[in-house]
Structures are given as C-alpha cells and as structure tokens.
C-alpha cells in the first residue's frame, strides 16, 4: 500500500509539472542588434535597384537640416529575402517588402528580436508597396527614432563617461558615452566629440 501511495504521489507531481506553464519550453526572443540609426531593407534585388529602392533611399536618407555637411537621417543596409533568416532577422529596425495578393501595411513590434520595429509592406507589385511606404513614412520614422532614442540611453547607461570637466567648470551634469572625448577645453568653452572615420555617426 505504501508503494502504491508513493507511486500515486509521483504521478500527481508529474501531472502538475507538465501542466505548469512556467515549465513549458517558451520561445526565447534574442536581443536585437545593429548600429544606431541603421535600417535593414528586405526586398528583391531588382526592386532595390529600381524605383522602389530609390523611393526608400529618397525617404529615409534625407540629410539632417542645419548641419554644415550632409549626414543622412538613417543608414540603409540591403538584405536579399533569400538571406533574411536567423541572425539577419535580429536587426533592430527593418523595412520588409513582400509580394502578396493581399495588399496591406503592418507595424510589428519585437517580431524576431527585442527591441525591434518591423514595417511590413505587402502588395501585388512595387507600386502598391511604394504607396504604403509613402503613406506611412512619418509613422515609421517616429517609431524608429523613438526606438533608437531608447537604445542610445541603454548604451549610455552601460558605459557612461567619467569625465567631470563640465561639472567642475560650469556646474552642468551631462550623461554621455565614453566614446565621446573632450577635444578642446578652454576657459569658457568645452568641445566634446566622438571620433569617427566614416564621415558620419550612423
């Protein structure tokens, strides 16, 4: 009888364990990756070299206003749909163009990684997809800009600067990454700059 009770008790534990949601294998969403202000663009190569690709470049690589030199708002990274799998899907910002009889636009959050913005354009041809792109450019830019702002703050919090020049000289507390260095320090002027070899910060 004791053995029977032990067996029944073991079965009860097994049943409870199997029905416990926390014990089931849950999908693990990886961390997103990519440089700041970089967007992965997924479409057929012919479309990328044609009108649709030009439309994406015109809308998302417009220069910032007020700078003495042209710096695009976003850097674009082209991906062929054939390689859009695995690690390639972990980009933080994605424009995904798909040929489909059901024409629609969708904004997906954390679809393949976290944090992530995926703008999905479906249409019978490039013209339909370009229409949805133009209609939603403002929303997409706002979403990506906010996504990048959060990512910048996360990176700053991981490696904040230890320089105290601003605090000592002007009583100003400013948090910025260690990648930025003081390159000029005078009586009433401090110049902080991030060294770059690409001509822009994207």
Segments and roles (model prediction):
Residues 19-201:
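N-terminal targeting sequences that direct proteins away from the cytosol to non-cytosolic compartments
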Residues 4-11:
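Sec-dependent signal peptide recognition
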């Amino acid at each position: 009888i004791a053995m029977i009770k032990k067996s029944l008790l073991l079965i009860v534990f097994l049943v409870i364990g199997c029905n416990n949601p926390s014990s089931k294998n849950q999908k693990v969403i990886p961390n997103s990756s990519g440089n700041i202000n970089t967007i992965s663009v997924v479409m057929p190569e012919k479309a990328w070299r044609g009108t649709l690709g030009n439309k994406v470049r015109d809308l998302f690589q417009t220069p910032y206003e007020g700078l003495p030199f042209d710096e695009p708002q976003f850097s674009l990274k082209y991906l062929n749909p054939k390689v859009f799998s695995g690690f390639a899907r972990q980009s933080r910002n994605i424009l995904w163009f798909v040929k489909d009889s059901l024409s629609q636009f969708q904004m997906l959050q954390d679809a393949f990684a976290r944090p992530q913005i995926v703008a999905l354009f479906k249409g019978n041809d490039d013209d339909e997809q370009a229409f949805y792109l133009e209609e939603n450019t403002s929303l997409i830019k706002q979403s990506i800009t906010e996504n990048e702002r959060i990512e910048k703050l996360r990176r700053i919090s991981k490696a904040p600067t230890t320089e105290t020049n601003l605090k000592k000289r002007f009583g100003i507390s400013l948090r910025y990454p260690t990648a930025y260095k003081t390159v000029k320090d005078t009586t009433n002027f401090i110049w902080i700059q991030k060294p770059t070899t690409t001509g822009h910060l994207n």
